[in-house]
Amino acid sequence: MSQFFYIHPENPQARLINQAVEILQKGGVIVYPTDSGYALGCMMGDKHAMDRIVAIRKLPEGHNFTLVCSDLSELSTYARVNNTAYRLIKNNTPGRYTFILTATKELPRRLMTSKRKTIGLRVPDNKIALDLLSALGEPILSCSLMLPNEEHTTQSDPEEIRDRLEHQVDLIIHGGYLGQEPTTVVDLTEESPVILREGSGSTAPFI
């Protein structure tokens, strides 16, 4: 059975943040809040935890995960960012966007797509998520918490999440009741941005 932490959305308790980081570092799978609903997360290099997330979501083989980063500097460690992309990302992070970028060699090979060496990255506008990332010291490997047969909305009610997933994850963080619309996905691998999915972030800056 999973642990269940009530963490204040504006003033996260450092003790609980540190306990959440310990769970991640021990191979745990967590549910945590972002600015676009709840997400499943684990350590970037933990294949077993990654496989557990695949099973929970019933994801197809080769599904693209996202690296949730603390800031633009950390994002730039794992992706090649040209001047145009840098400006667009800087002007729109933290925020409700996932950016598709060409991966650097710092990224574990299994996290890249097979046809194109790309990765999705984002910097969330959520205090709990940012405190987790700061305490962890590296990105969290994540995907939106969309359960099977409910692929168009992210889970927003942590009490309902506990009812459905308490035997499948190691920690659920209650950080408030959140929106249900996933991030807007923007491909920045070419000279001009391409909107791959319209979500909770405005597409106006990229058109």
From Swiss-Prot:
Q: GO molecular function: any one?
A: double-stranded RNA binding
What's the superkingdom here? Bacteria
Question: What PROSITE patterns does UniProt report for this protein, alphabetically?
Answer: YRDC (PS51163)
- Pfam families assigned to the protein according to its UniProt record, in alphabetical order: Sua5_yciO_yrdC
**In this protein, which residues make up the domain named YrdC-like?**
14-201
Q: Which family does it belong to?
A: Belongs to the SUA5 family.
NCBIfam families for this protein: L-threonylcarbamoyladenylate synthase (TIGR00057)
Its protein name is Uncharacterized protein HI_1198
Organism of derivation: Haemophilus influenzae (strain ATCC 51907 / DSM 11121 / KW20 / Rd)
